[in-house]
């Protein structure tokens, strides 16, 4: 170690790079890139953190305490980290060694903290076993007194002499002053930081900053003559009373303990490991193969215990396994050879010189074992004590000591360590759970305050009558057995104060049994015996030094009198009792308790710890489990008890395939199997309890109720006093007038509800079936099925019967037709609180719908199909469900990945019913759009001058850019770490060869991608070959088409559409496109390139139906179209953006030859000579959509032909100007004939302004109108006309009303409009924006009117009001309205304008 208090911080690496390829495959990301970025961030954090020896964290118990707020979803337990010298720093998840200052941020599944510590800082003096002041978590302050102080006792009567003894006082104990210690009568012994009173001989150590030597002296040795000469009896009593923990305990209780101590171990060593005790390891070799050439004793001495499989042994410390033993093998040598870093081996090496000294110093009498030492103080002192006792007193003393020995022997046997679990959990005994610390909170009966306790703190505070409460399987039994085991093993000095510890199971006793009889029957076995008289005398004499661990408590009435008295009249015996009680039963004994300990949920790191030990031979399996729970955070709590962990271990052992599933339902099923095995004798009552609890769970789930009262239980037929009920539910009474009941967890409630629903739907009774259908039909939207009730339905499918499955499948697949449910989706808030991950899922689906309802519908349909097929296959009812499935598939567009479903392998003909399948190929090229939106609009604008309270209406573009750049960087980093995922074509339909049916239409979306690699090309070749028709949509993906040329060459005749945006086509790609004979649709947009070679040869696409050309820079597109272009007689859609120089006659000629034209979009600035264009358009009777962008024509020429377009659905003229009133009136009159019109974007101009009211009235004759836009033409009179028309019953289908940029409307006009607007049941979007020069500052009455207007629009989800200057009070009104709105979760208000300047603040 460097100088104490200093530590050099070199760059270190926590990453196991050799395992990163494997991790990359499991996570689906580039783990090398993630690791590199993570290491850099962690190095920066390390450089900021304080270094140097931290004397305040010498105590392992204190280090353990720092992990109270530590994330439980980790691979290392706090116990492992604290034992390895680490404490939690509070900086992220960083832990730091108190000695060498090593800082670690990550956890490793394959390396324990001690191993990581050893690898990164082998020079750490703590690891090397040097004296750096470490205090073991179970260590105590009281030490064995030295037989002779240095220089004799007499020389230390003077304080100065005592002070001189502290010359070599260790550096780590400088927080306690030698002067204060010497003043309190202590002399430094020269060993560690141990001091001894010159007067009473009391010896103390483990001094920490803030300790008061006088207080410690008074607590542990209150009879000391020197102490009593310096402090009054009142002061001594105050010291004792204010001492934390160890009530009624003095140093004498530790010094004269009968417990045999194991030889000391290196402090970094985890000294409470189950098999640290040699006897325990020896006990595991009972079934060791007799033919093995290696002796058991040698294996045990080398640290190994038998795994029970073949001749495989495992080290209790490092977990290393060895097998295939041969003649002459030396276990210790092999241990050193294969696992040289093992801490146990390091311990032996470090103790090589210490052990002989210890053995000689603490030599045992010949009558006792040589490997242990009797720790009841000086032998002569004990002998004299016995001599002074009377004959009968001596008898109880001898019997008590003999009993103590028998108890310790019993607690270290395998029969005690193994729990009596049924065969479902037989593979996992208590052995694997004893080393796990349960999470405990302490609740003082007379105070409402709760406090989290570490196990050392629990041990320090054991006194009087206490209980440990918890659910079934929460670890109560394991906890009590661990206390007994640690006491017996000699590895826990905190428990030395107890001379007798009785672990008694109350489930196997009768009320007429005596206490001695119970102890003999349960703990002493054959030949063991103790009389009631001697037992009573021992308890009477030892009092606080007797600990009863009472398990399986079920009530006072069933207890024998002796135990009843110990609990209810503890003041008589003054013994210590710790009673394990189910949460439901605590109230029964609350009156007699001083403190209640409550076991919390089993931390996930304990689950990992158990599984790592149990499946050390298959650590990848444990890695997969952790990754599964990273992806499914909502499910992390299912391992809430050790019993559930036992269930998953058993399931993994019995079913190897289960290791890849990690399904939470398996846990619950295993738990229910455990209950059925345990309660075989009462199978019918158990089934009745499960059924009634299932009914309660089902009712609660559909009413979002997860807490119940007695009335709820009674209504469901649940007997709250039935013991079996406590196996499924918990009762909570603290701080409540009436008890509250909860299931073991929200997920477990859903599981039981699922069991009940299946039971109802499968019943022969019509009433049950009807009730089941009633609940099923409450899942009345696709979003509920795939979100709120997704987990529940998954549980139902795991129990689905042949009778129930078709009913569920039919219901689920009909939900996709519920269009309204998607548009009006809202989350169940109570459910979301319990399942935060579900809320994120909901937000994703809702966001997808807002952006693309079509994509959302496809996404939802896919999930409903997957769910339905799970039901069909789990229940073997595919044939019965197929009619519903086939009907569902008809006309659907789904993702390509659905073909991996088994159904498409079994029924490939169903593929023909689909409309299309979609596949997306996404790269990591980024395309920024920031500058395009602002460059031209703001360049001539001056910053607005406004009052200071309105500044929040503007956001500077630099801030917006900064946030945008940050988001862009996050996305870029995310994309970079995720390798391009290939479309999965490994299962289902793809297993068929040859393919009996082809994909009707394949839609290929390619985004931000460069050239395809060979792997992707191979996939596309197979997918293309299985497709009848292929459509491409390419965005920002230059070069991609050329890279997939081999795949296109094989499927030329299948490509029917190619849409390309923001990319440039190479000459090779243009030539490739020209070889596609079946191309029907071609779109090129948002690029400066004019692909002349392609356009010159468009006539070669004989089947072309759609052409869309929107190029930046407005090149003369018409000039490059071939003369033969009019020969494409099938053209249905023509969308052209061209320049003013274009030859208009050429366009006219084209249209003349397109009799089937449905859609015509033109963007240009012709202004004149457009009569011929209008004439030819008038002949296109099938036109459904017309859009003119730019000033394309003289108004009257178009108005004259407008009545011809009787099939028109979309008319977009918002860029056109109608200057005169006559033309505008004629336009308004013509609108009335467009009965099928759905979208109308009204032109601008003075003429339109004058007839705006007439246009509004004419729109009332358009019953299909969904979108209505007025820009720059409305005033107060015309805008109120819209409100009146709506109120009178017009515009019933209107979804989007855009009246933005109408600066002739005054504040009064807006206020009147808001007050009058009503009766628009389907309006989803309202736009009232203004530009910056036309910004409006309104009064409170106008804001109030707007709020009232919004309240009357029940479907509104977007309100645009840029350049409305609103202060804090105004926004409060708007937000209050939003909170109360029916669409409050979806309603978005756009009011903040992004600008490239800061507004001028008026003085």
Swiss-Prot record:
Binding site for Zn(2+): 315, 318, 335, 342
Binding positions (ATP): 473-478
Database matches in SMART domains: BIR
Gene Ontology CC terms, in alphabetical order: IPAF inflammasome complex
Tissue-specificity statement: Detected in macrophages (at protein level).
Consequence of substituting residue 857 to Y: No effect on production of IL1B in response to bacterial flagellin
GO biological process: apoptotic process; defense response to bacterium; defense response to Gram-negative bacterium; detection of bacterium; inflammatory response; innate immune response; negative regulation of apoptotic process; positive regulation of interleukin-1 beta production
NACHT domain sequence ranges: 464-759
Effect after changing residue 847 to K: Nearly abolishes interaction with flagellin
PROSITE patterns tied to this protein: BIR_REPEAT_1, BIR_REPEAT_2, NACHT
Sequence ranges of the BIR repeats: 60-127, 159-227, 278-345
Keywords (A to Z) from UniProt: Apoptosis, ATP-binding, Immunity, Inflammatory response, Innate immunity, Metal-binding, Nucleotide-binding, Repeat, Zinc
GO molecular function: ATP binding; cysteine-type endopeptidase inhibitor activity involved in apoptotic process; metal ion binding
Function: Sensor component of the NLRC4 inflammasome that specifically recognizes and binds flagellin from pathogenic bacteria such as Legionella or Salmonella. Association of pathogenic bacteria proteins drives in turn drive assembly and activation of the NLRC4 inflammasome, promoting caspase-1 activation, cytokine production and macrophage pyroptosis. The NLRC4 inflammasome is activated as part of the innate immune response to a range of intracellular bacteria.
The protein's assembly and partners: Component of the NLRC4 inflammasome, at least composed of NLRC4, caspase-1 (CASP1) and some NAIP protein. Flagellin binding by NAIP5 triggers assembly of the inflammasome, a huge complex that contains a single NAIP5 chain and multiple copies of NLRC4. (Microbial infection) Interacts with S.typhimurium (Salmonella) flagellin.
Descriptive protein name: Baculoviral IAP repeat-containing protein 1e
Species of the source: Mus musculus (Mouse)
Taxonomic path: Eukaryota, Metazoa, Chordata, Craniata, Vertebrata
Gene name linked to the record: Naip5
């Amino acid at each position: 170690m460097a100088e104490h208090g200093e530590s050099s911080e070199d760059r270190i690496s926590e990453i196991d790079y050799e395992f990163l390829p494997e991790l990359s495959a499991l996570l689906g990301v580039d783990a090398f890139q993630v690791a590199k970025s993570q290491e850099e961030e962690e190095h920066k954090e390390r450089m900021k953190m304080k270094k140097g020896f931290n004397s305040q964290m010498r105590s392992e118990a204190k280090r353990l305490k720092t992990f109270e707020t530590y994330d439980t979803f980790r691979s290392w337990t706090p116990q492992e980290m604290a034992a390895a010298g680490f404490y939690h720093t509070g900086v992220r998840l960083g832990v730091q060694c108190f000695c060498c200052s090593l800082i670690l941020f990550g956890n490793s599944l394959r390396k324990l903290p001690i191993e990581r510590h050893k690898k990164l800082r082998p020079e750490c003096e703590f690891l090397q076993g040097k004296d750096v002041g470490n205090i073991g978590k179970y260590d105590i302050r009281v030490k064995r007194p030295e037989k002779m102080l240095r220089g004799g006792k007499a020389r230390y009567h003077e304080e100065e002499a005592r002070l001189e003894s502290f010359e070599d006082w260790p550096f780590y104990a400088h927080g306690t002053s030698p002067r204060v210690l010497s003043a309190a009568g202590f002399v430094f012994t020269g060993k560690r930081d141990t001091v001894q009173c010159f007067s009473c001989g009391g010896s103390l150590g483990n001094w920490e900053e803030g300790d008061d030597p006088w207080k410690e002296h008074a607590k542990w040795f209150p009879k000391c003559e020197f102490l009593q000469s310096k402090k009054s009896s009142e002061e001594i009593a105050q010291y004792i009373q204010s001492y934390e923990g160890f009530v009624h305990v003095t140093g004498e209780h530790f010094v004269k303990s009968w417990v045999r101590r194991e030889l000391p171990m290196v402090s970094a060593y985890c000294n409470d490991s189950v098999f640290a005790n040699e006897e325990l390891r020896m006990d595991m070799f009972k079934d060791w193969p007799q033919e093995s050439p290696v002796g058991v004793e040698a294996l045990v001495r080398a640290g190994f215990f038998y795994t029970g499989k073949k001749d495989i042994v495992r080290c209790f410390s490092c977990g290393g396994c060895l097998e295939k033993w041969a003649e002459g093998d030396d276990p210790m040598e092999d241990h050193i050879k294969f696992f040289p870093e093992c801490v146990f081996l390091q311990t032996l090496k470090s103790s090589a010189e210490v052990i002989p000294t210890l053995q000689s110093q603490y030599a045992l009498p010949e009558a006792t074992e040589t490997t242990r030492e009797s720790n009841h103080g000086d032998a002569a002192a004990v002998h004299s004590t016995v001599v002074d006792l009377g004959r009968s007193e001596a008898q109880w003393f001898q019997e008590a000591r003999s009993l103590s020995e028998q108890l310790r022997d019993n607690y270290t046997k395998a029969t005690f360590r193994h729990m009596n679990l049924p065969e479902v959990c037989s593979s996992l005994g208590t052995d694997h759970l004893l080393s796990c610390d349960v999470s405990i909170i302490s609740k003082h009966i007379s105070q409402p305050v709760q406090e989290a306790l570490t196990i050392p703190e629990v041990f320090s505070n054991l006194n009087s009558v206490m209980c440990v409460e918890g659910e079934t399987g929460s670890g109560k039994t394991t906890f009590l057995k661990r206390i007994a085991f640690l006491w017996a093993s000699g590895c826990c000095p905190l428990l030395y104060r107890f001379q007798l510890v009785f672990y008694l199971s109350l489930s196997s006793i009768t009320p007429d049994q005596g206490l001695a009889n119970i102890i003999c029957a349960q703990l002493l076995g054959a030949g063991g015996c103790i009389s009631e008289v001697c037992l009573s005398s021992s308890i009477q004499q030892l009092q606080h030094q007797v600990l009863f661990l009472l398990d399986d408590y079920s009530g006072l009435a069933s207890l024998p009198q002796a135990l009843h008295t110990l609990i209810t009249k503890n003041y008589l015996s003054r013994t210590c009792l710790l009673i394990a009680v189910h949460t439901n039963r605590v109230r029964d004994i609350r009156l007699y308790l001083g403190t209640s300990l409550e076991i919390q949920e089993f931390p996930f790191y304990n689950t990992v710890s158990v599984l790592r030990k149990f499946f050390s031979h298959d650590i990848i399996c444990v890695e997969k489990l952790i990754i599964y729970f990273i992806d499914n955070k909502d499910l992390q709590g299912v391992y809430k008890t050790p019993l559930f962990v036992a269930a998953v271990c058993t399931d993994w052992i019995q079913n190897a395939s289960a290791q890849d599933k990690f399904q939470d339902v398996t846990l619950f099923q295993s738990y229910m199997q455990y209950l059925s095995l345990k309660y075989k004798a009462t199978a019918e009552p158990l089934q009745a309890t499960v059924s009634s609890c299932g009914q309660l769970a089902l009712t609660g789930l559909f009413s979002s109720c997860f807490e119940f009262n007695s009335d709820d239980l009674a209504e469901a037929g649940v007997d709250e006093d039935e013991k079996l009920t406590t196996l499924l539910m918990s009762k909570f009474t603290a701080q409540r007038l009436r008890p509250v009941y909860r299931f073991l967890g929200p997920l477990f409630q859903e599981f039981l509800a699922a069991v009940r629903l299946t039971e109802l739907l499968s019943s022969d009774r019509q009433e049950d079936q009807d009730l089941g259908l009633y609940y099923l039909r409450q899942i009345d939207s696709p979003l509920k099925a795939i979100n709120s009730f997704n987990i529940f339905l998954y549980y139902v499918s795991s129990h689905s019967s042949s009778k129930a499955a078709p009913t569920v499948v039919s219901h689920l697949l009909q939900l996709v037709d519920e269009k309204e449910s998607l548009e009006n989706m809202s989350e169940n808030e109570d459910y979301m609180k319990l399942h935060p991950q579900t809320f994120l899922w909901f937000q994703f689906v809702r966001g997808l719908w807002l952006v693309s309802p079509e994509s959302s519908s496809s996404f939802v349909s896919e999930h409903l199909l997957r769910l339905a097929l799970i039901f069909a296959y789990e229940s073997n009812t595919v044939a019965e469900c197929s009619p519903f499935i086939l009907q569902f598939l008809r006309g659907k567009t789904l993702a390509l990945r659905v073909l991996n479903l088994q159904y498409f392998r079994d029924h490939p003909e169903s593929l023909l019913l689909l409309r299309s399948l979609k596949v997306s190929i996404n790269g990591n090229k980024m395309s920024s759009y920031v500058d395009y939106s602002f460059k031209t609009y703001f360049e001539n604008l001056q910053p607005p001058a406004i009052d200071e309270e309105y500044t929040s209406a503007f956001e500077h573009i630099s801030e917006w850019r900064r946030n945008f750049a940050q988001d862009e960087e996050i996305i870029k980093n995310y994309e970079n770490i995720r390798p391009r995922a290939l479309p999965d074509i490994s299962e289902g339909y793809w297993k068929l060869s040859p393919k009996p049916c082809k994909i009707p239409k394949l839609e290929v979306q390619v985004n931000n991608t460069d050239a395809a690699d060979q792997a992707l090309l191979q996939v596309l070749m197979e997918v293309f070959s299985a497709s009848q028709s292929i459509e491409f949509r390419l965005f920002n993906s230059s070069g991609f088409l050329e890279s997939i040329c081999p795949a296109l060459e094989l499927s030329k005749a299948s490509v029917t559409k190619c849409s390309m945006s923001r990319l440039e086509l190479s000459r090779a790609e243009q030539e490739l496109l020209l070889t596609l004979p079946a191309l029907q649709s071609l779109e090129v947009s948002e690029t400066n390139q004019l692909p002349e070679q392609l356009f010159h040869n468009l006539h070669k696409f004989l089947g072309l139906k759609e052409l869309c050309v929107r190029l930046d820079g407005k090149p003369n597109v018409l000039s490059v179209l071939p003369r033969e272009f009019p020969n494409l007689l099938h053209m249905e859609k023509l969308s052209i953006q061209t320049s003013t120089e274009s030859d208009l006659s050429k366009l006219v000629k084209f249209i003349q030859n397109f009799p089937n034209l449905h859609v015509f979009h033109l963007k240009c600035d012709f202004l004149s000579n457009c009569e011929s264009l209008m004439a030819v358009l008038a002949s296109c009777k099938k036109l459904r959509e017309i859009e003119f962008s730019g000033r394309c024509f003289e108004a009257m020429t178009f108005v004259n032909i407008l009545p011809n377009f009787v099939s028109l659905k979309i008319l977009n003229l918002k860029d056109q100007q109608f200057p005169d009133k006559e033309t505008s009136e004629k336009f308004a009159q013509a609108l009335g004939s467009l009965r099928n019109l759905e979208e109308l974007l009204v032109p601008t101009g003075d003429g339109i302004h004058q007839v705006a009211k007439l246009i509004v009235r004419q729109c009332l004759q358009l019953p299909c109108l969904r979108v209505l836009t007025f820009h720059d033409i409305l005033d107060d009179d015309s805008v109120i006309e819209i409100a009146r028309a709506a109120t009178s019953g017009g515009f019933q289908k209107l979804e989007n009303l855009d009246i933005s940029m109408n600066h002739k409307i005054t504040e009064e006009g807006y206020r009147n409009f808001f007050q009058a607007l009503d009766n628009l049941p389907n309006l989803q979007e309202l736009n009232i924006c203004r530009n910056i020069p036309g910004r409006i500052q309104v009064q409170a009455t106008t804001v109030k009117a707007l709020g009232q207007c919004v309240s009357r629009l029940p479907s509104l989800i977007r309100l645009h009001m840029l350049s409305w200057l609103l202060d804090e009070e105004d926004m409060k009104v708007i937000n209050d309205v939003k909170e109360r709105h029916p669409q409050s979760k979806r309603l978005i208000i756009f009011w903040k304008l992004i600008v490239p300047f800061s507004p001028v603040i008026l003085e």
